[in-house]
Amino acid sequence: MARTKQTARISTGGKAPRKQLAPKAARQSAPATGGVKKPHRFRPGTVALRDIRKYQKSTEILIRKLPFQRLVREIAQDFKTDLRFQSSAVAALQEAAEAYLVGLFEDTNLCAIHAKRVTIMPKEIQLARRIRGERARGE
């Protein structure tokens, strides 16, 4: 479709007539058809950025203690049965595991940014581990 020039139009002048509002008593008695208010929705990415700032400020552990403890005991079973753990030992393992994961995700994010993306993918995690010199499982 070809573009055409806009021509000037003559204005009809004046303002459009306003609708008359119903009297206050009549408005209150009328049933509200759209009375259900929609929940507020943030724009995509806003909540994610808020969460990032929140977790970067905080220092508390993010993995739940009992599931982590069960995982540690399950892995330890492969090496020796009937092992017992002090609670401080499990806490130290959890602190170290979270520090490792945070560092890995930082490096992974840098790899994704280098690829001109903001979404991390498994290939970035693999690249970050390879650059760090870590061996993959099964090698």
Curated annotation (Swiss-Prot):
GO terms for molecular function: DNA binding; protein heterodimerization activity; structural constituent of chromatin. The modification N6,N6-dimethyllysine is found at K5, K37. Keywords: Acetylation, Chromosome, DNA-binding, Methylation, Nucleosome core, Nucleus, Phosphoprotein. InterPro entries: Histone-fold, Histone_H2A/H2B/H3, Histone_H3/CENP-A. The modification N6,N6,N6-trimethyllysine is found at K5, K37. Belongs to the histone H3 family. This is Histone H3-like 5. It comes from Arabidopsis thaliana.
